[in-house]
Amino acid sequence: MKILLLEPYFTGSHKSWAEGYQSNSAHEIQIISLPGQFWKWRMHGGAITIAKEFLQLDFDPDLIIATDMLDLTSFLSLTRERTSHIPTVLYFHENQITYPWSLTDRDVQEKRDVHYGFINLSSALAADHVLFNSKYHLNSFMTGGKKILKHFPDHQELDTIDKIQSKSRIYILV
């Protein structure tokens, strides 16, 4: 199987996981990544750069695996002519709903800290399959996701959590 792995924050544990998966898998894995810096910008703009790189790449994957740092909805909308028929998996190595924030972060101080979690939610909704690395991680994402949606004044779309849950699994990639 030919797998395209998308990682916009290629450093530390993200890099170790991606390279470990690539080197230990029986599948042919092509990684498109960006340097592991400016994590907020990677979550906003990384999909645009990665989409551009993918469209220039001579690689036709059977499966696309994106990590939680990618805005999968933006990537898919920018690459639909090549990706509309390819199954997608969103892999949560971590997530921005339950990841601890620094109290000195300006987004926390200005009460804007739900935006990155919402990117994770919309990406999970857009993916065909959603994988988590532990049961705790899956459960805390679903609970936290519902809490984020309840934060909004209307059209909370709480049923989207059930849709995400129905296509979510705990999985160690091999």
What are these regions (language model features)?
Residues 15-16, 73-77, 100-101, 141-142:
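Short glycine-/acidic-enriched loop or helix-start segments at secondary-structure transitions
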Residues 2-4, 55-78, 84, 89-91, ...:
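Short N-terminal targeting/anchoring amphipathic segment
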Residues 9-12, 69-73, 174:
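Short beta->alpha connector loops
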Residues 5-7, 32, 91, 133, ...:
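Short hydrophobic segments within beta-strands
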Residues 64, 82-101, 106-116, 120-125, ...:
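Active-site proximal beta-strand in glycosyltransferases
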Residues 1-38, 42-61:
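N-terminal subdomain of nucleotide-sugar transferases
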Residues 126-167, 172:
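A short, active-site helix/loop in glycosyltransferases that binds the activated sugar's phosphate group
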Residues 35-37, 94-96, 136:
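Short beta-alpha junction loops
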